[in-house]
Curated annotation (Swiss-Prot):
<comment type="subunit">
    <text>Forms a heterotetramer with UvrA during the search for lesions. Interacts with UvrC in an incision complex.</text>
</comment>
<dbReference type="GO" id="GO:0016887">
    <property type="term" value="F:ATP hydrolysis activity"/>
</dbReference>
<dbReference type="Pfam" id="PF00271">
    <property type="entry name" value="Helicase_C"/>
</dbReference>
<dbReference type="InterPro" id="IPR001943">
    <property type="entry name" value="UVR_dom"/>
</dbReference>
<dbReference type="InterPro" id="IPR014001">
    <property type="entry name" value="Helicase_ATP-bd"/>
</dbReference>
<dbReference type="InterPro" id="IPR041471">
    <property type="entry name" value="UvrB_inter"/>
</dbReference>
<dbReference type="GO" id="GO:0003677">
    <property type="term" value="F:DNA binding"/>
</dbReference>
<dbReference type="Pfam" id="PF02151">
    <property type="entry name" value="UVR"/>
</dbReference>
<dbReference type="GO" id="GO:0005737">
    <property type="term" value="C:cytoplasm"/>
</dbReference>
<keyword id="KW-0067">ATP-binding</keyword>
<keyword id="KW-0267">Excision nuclease</keyword>
<dbReference type="GO" id="GO:0005524">
    <property type="term" value="F:ATP binding"/>
</dbReference>
<keyword id="KW-0227">DNA damage</keyword>
<protein>
    <recommendedName>
        <fullName>UvrABC system protein B</fullName>
    </recommendedName>
</protein>
<dbReference type="Pfam" id="PF12344">
    <property type="entry name" value="UvrB"/>
</dbReference>
<dbReference type="InterPro" id="IPR004807">
    <property type="entry name" value="UvrB"/>
</dbReference>
<feature type="binding site">
    <location>
        <begin position="38"/>
        <end position="45"/>
    </location>
    <ligand>
        <name>ATP</name>
    </ligand>
</feature>
């Protein structure tokens, strides 16, 4: 095991040393729950990293959205460059679950689009957990959704050794059993191809390496790694451990047993419908399930196979399904779950289960699914919160549930390493808020700084964006319908100065870490509700806490209880921060944060768009982009899409010139 070692030019400062010591000691003395109350800009992520370094145990870091998960993944890869830092979020670019609307007699088929790169990263995460000890996985709430059994996954491991006696046909059959597909023409991840006594395997979890196995008769003569794009040899290996192509793979024995139990459940359910005289549901369930059974028996898979997960994993009715947490538990060693922005993340867990259950109960009732489909579900809140040995809740505004669970194991991180104080705030009359804000925006932009504006409705945000754009302000609007990749690009555009003002509805949920922002404007701050609650106001005000000139304007007709409490919390924190600075002779300074490389989840066009915004790209980064685009160019040529191949060729030439 490679020890966890934080790589950073900084040492703990401000409130970080006492928070690190208290929380690490709490976990080491076997307390299950602890909370870090850390203000925006206090270096909570660095504190989390130092706690992991101190504990030396595998860690799952969970948060409530993909944007924040991507940001954390980038930061932790920087902190732990020599350890296995993995990324686990939903692999769907688009997902429409199957559903039935009885009053309209309308059945909606499941429809989805899987992002291959996200799928690779998910496989890489589970593979690392089984193969290594020094693993950190950054995940969204997808970590709570069902996966295949880790025990079955381990059974599917194939070790290859030079000199091993193994018939080529045996290996080919084993690869098929492991979920790999033969493809001698369009070779991609999860495929293998055969050329005489040479088998090339592209592991489903590999970023850019192909495994070549060369036989001499019934003996493995050579194992080598090849570059996936140019097929150049990267080196020879004495052995190689190959993992399955997906997390839902099961062995033949388990599969045959599952077919029997599915048939048994089907017979029982059909008898129920027969007794009730519900022949429409009887016919529907019989036709759908028998078709699925035939497909599973012939190919090992069917559309919607996850609905049979209870049978495929051997779980009992109502038993907790397998999830990513079981891969952490598999080796029987302690691990830590860090829940970032816990005041938002934890409530999602209960909501996920309730929504999933409600939809599937309708499907089961009307004969679209067997009752066992109800066990293909995310973890409940209670299951999640009692599964791991140690939890660390992290938030600037933890909810009562986190504080109650943690009891005395709570550390405050109010003093920032930079000495920055919580931003000054000012309450302004909201009667003429748009015009008044325009003057403030001009002054901030003239200093080369940025502005965040939060509105109450989508319509208002859109109109505000158009209004300021017509007045010559470089402004963009960010809303919930924008996907994670575009959201990251918008945030980067704000930081680089592509535009100066970002308008949103609930920007506090976007995981924004923007040192360039010196003004946060909260429109209609006196409209009590979720978007203007005490927690939301504190979180939003904190977006201005990374800049020395940080200010918050609260536009309102009156001061609400939520506003009053948020301002009191801000005053308390400023007082404590000022006292610490005076005592230690600290002069506040703005946060400096590099424009880190974004998580590479884009298509080729996005890669070029990202590259073209940089004046100078590091050589390693440039070569990585070129390699990915070259691969896409070759794929386009194979598909006879020469126009696309030519476009990619031209873009590669442009990137080489940057």
């Amino acid at each position: 095991m490679q020890p966890f070692k934080v790589h950073s030019p900084y040492e703990p400062a401000g409130d970080q040393p006492q928070a690190i010591e208290k929380l690490a000691q709490s976990i080491q003395t076997q307390h299950r729950y602890q909370t870090l109350v850390g203000v925006t800009g206090s270096g909570k992520t660095y504190t989390m990293a130092k706690i992991i370094e101190k504990l030396q145990i595998p860690t799952l870091i969970m948060t409530h959205n993909k944007t924040l998960a991507a940001q954390l993944y980038s930061e932790f890869r920087g902190f732990f460059p020599k350890n296995h830092v993995e990324y686990f979020i939903s692999h769907f670019d688009y997902y429409q679950p199957e559903a039935y609307i009885p009053r309209q007699d309308l059945f909606i088929e499941k429809d989805s689009s899987i992002n291959e790169e996200l799928e690779r990263l998910r496989l890489s995460a589970t593979t690392s957990l089984l193969a290594h000890e020094d693993v950190i996985v950054v995940a969204s709430v997808s970590a709570n959704y069902g996966l295949g059994s880790p025990a079955e996954y381990v059974q599917m491991i194939q070790k290859l050794e030079v000199g091993e006696r193994l018939h080529q046909r045996e290996l080919l059959l084993r690869l098929v059993e492991m979920g790999y597909k033969r493809n001698d023409n369009f070779f991609d991840r999860g495929d293998f191809r055969v050329n005489g006594e040479v088998i090339d395997i592209y592991p489903a979890y590999s970023e850019d390496e192909v495994v070549r196995v060369e036989f001499f008769g019934d003996e493995i003569e050579r194992i080598a790694l090849l570059d996936s794009v140019d097929r150049q040899a990267l080196g020879e290996l004495p052995s190689y451990i190959l993992y399955a192509a997906n997390q839902f793979i099961v062995g033949q024995n388990r599969l045959h047993e599952a077919l029997k139990t599915i048939e048994s459940e089907l017979e029982e359910r059909l008898a129920f419908y027969q007794k009730e005289g519900r022949m429409v549901e009887h016919a529907r369930l019989k036709q759908r399930t028998e078709f699925d059974l035939e497909m599973i028996g012939a190919t090992g898979i069917c559309k919607g196979i996850e609905n049979y997960s209870r049978h495929l994993t051997g779980k009992k009715v109502g038993e907790t399904p397998y999830s990513l947490l079981d891969y952490f538990e598999f080796k029987g060693k302690p691990y830590l779950i860090i829940v970032d922005e816990s005041h938002v993340s934890l409530p999602q867990f209960g909501g996920m289960y309730a929504g999933d259950r409600s939809r599937k109960e309708v499907l089961v009732e009307h004969g679209f699914r067997l009752p066992s489909a109800l066990d293909n579900r995310p973890l409940t809140y209670e299951e999640f919160i009692t599964k791991a040995p140690h939890y660390l809740f992290v938030s600037a505004t933890p909810a009562p549930r986190e504080l109650e669970l943690s009891q005395a194991q709570i550390a405050e991180q109010i003093v920032r390493p930079t000495g920055l104080l919580d931003p000054l705030y000012e309450v302004r009359d909201s009667q003429n808020q748009v015009a008044a804000l325009f003057d403030e925006i001009k002054a901030v932009v003239a200093r080369g700084e940025r502005v965040l504006i939060t509105a109450l409705t989508k319509k208002m945000a859109e109109e505000l964006t158009k209004y300021y754009a017509d007045l010559g302000i470089k402004v963009r609007y960010m809303h919930s319908e924008i996907d994670a990749i575009e959201r990251n690009q918008i945030i980067r555009g704000l930081r680089t100065g592509e535009f100066d003002v970002l308008v949103g509805i609930n920007l506090l949920r976007e995981g924004l870490d923007l040192p360039e922002v010196s003004l946060v404007a909260i429109l209609d701050a006196d409209k009590e509700g979720f978007l203007r609650s005490e927690t939301s106001l504190i979180q939003t005000m904190g977006r201005a806490a990374r800049n020395l000139n940080g200010r918050v304007l609260l536009f309102a007709q009156k001061i609400t209880p939520s506003m009053k409490r948020a301002m009191e919390v801000t005053d308390y924190r400023r007082s404590k921060q000022q006292e610490f600075n005076q005592k230690h002779g600290i002069t506040p300074k703005s946060v400096t944060r590099k424009l880190d490389e974004e998580l590479r989840l884009e298509g080729v066009g996005d890669l070029y768009a990202k590259a073209s915004k940089k004046e100078k790209i590091p050589k390693a980064e440039r070569e990585k982009i070129i390699k990915e685009m070259t691969k896409k160019m070759h794929e386009a040529a194979k598909l006879l899409d020469f126009e696309e191949a030519a476009r990619l060729r031209d873009e590669i030439a442009k990137i080489r010139a940057l």
